[in-house]
């Protein structure tokens, strides 16, 4: 995983939420890049990209998760940022919608995903691959598996930065993925016989950038002058 302190992507995502609470002109991602990042912040390889937008709120000196939603579908980056900046801020079912009074305490992260590789699959004549073929701190992980009782298909993912933040090893990562998917009652069963229940394990990499309120607020005046 590579980490940039700020980028046009993160600023643009924050701007989408800000515009929900204040009347501001519509701007393009290119405008942000030109006026705040000297035209050098956009990367051609991410013109279309899967992405996740993460919101964290400063509380007791630490930033704590306030919302995170994204997509593995590859779409136009500007449209994806518009959509998932708001969905993650206002529609993450784990949290209440972010309110205007919280803006000054927020940090917005944007993770652009790439290098997807299926490292294990149960399809075909037999199981193939290695579920351990990934590196903590470099890869995000998505698993797809069958519920032991209902046989329904379940899935969950953790972005590359989540695993080292939590201090998990590889096995603990899979255990927490199973729990996240809603299968906590059968965690031990699934892990003990993962060859039976796992359908697919996919690793991927992320390029993450973040922007906190102070930097975002400073950039607002520059963008306003551009319009």
Curated annotation (Swiss-Prot):
The organism's place on the tree of life at top rank: Eukaryota
Q: Which residues form a coiled coil?
A: none
Stored PROSITE patterns? AMMECR1
**Residue intervals of the AMMECR1 domain:** 5-220
Which PANTHER family does this one have?
AMME SYNDROME CANDIDATE GENE 1 PROTEIN, AMMECR1 HOMOLOG
This protein's name: Uncharacterized protein KLLA0D02464g
Q: What organism, scientifically named, is this protein from? A: Kluyveromyces lactis (strain ATCC 8585 / CBS 2359 / DSM 70799 / NBRC 1267 / NRRL Y-1140 / WM37) (Yeast)
């Amino acid at each position: 995983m590579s980490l940039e302190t700020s980028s046009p992507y993160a600023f643009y995502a924050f701007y989408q939420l800000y515009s929900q609470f204040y009347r501001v002109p519509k701007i393009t991602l290119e405008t942000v890049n030109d006026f705040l990042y000297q035209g050098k912040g956009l990367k051609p390889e991410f013109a279309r990209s899967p992405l996740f937008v993460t919101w964290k709120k400063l509380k007791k000196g630490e930033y704590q998760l306030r919302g995170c939603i994204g997509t593995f579908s590859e779409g136009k980056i500007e449209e994806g940022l518009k959509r998932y900046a708001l969905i993650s801020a206002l529609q993450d079912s784990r949290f209440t919608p972010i309110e205007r009074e919280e803006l000054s305490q927020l940090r917005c992260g944007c993770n652009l995903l790439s290098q997807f590789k299926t490292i294990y699959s149960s399809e075909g004549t037999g199981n193939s691959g290695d579920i351990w073929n990934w590196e903590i701190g470099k890869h995000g992980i998505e698993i797809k598996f069958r519920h032991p009782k209902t046989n329904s298909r379940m899935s969950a993912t953790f972005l590359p930065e989540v695993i080292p933040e939590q201090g998990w090893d590889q096995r603990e990562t899979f255990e927490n993925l199973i729990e996240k998917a809603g299968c906590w009652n059968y965690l031990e069963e699934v892990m003990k016989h993962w060859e039976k229940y796992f359908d697919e394990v996919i690793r991927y990499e992320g390029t993450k950038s973040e922007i906190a309120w102070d930097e975002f607020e400073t950039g607002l005046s520059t963008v306003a002058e551009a319009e």
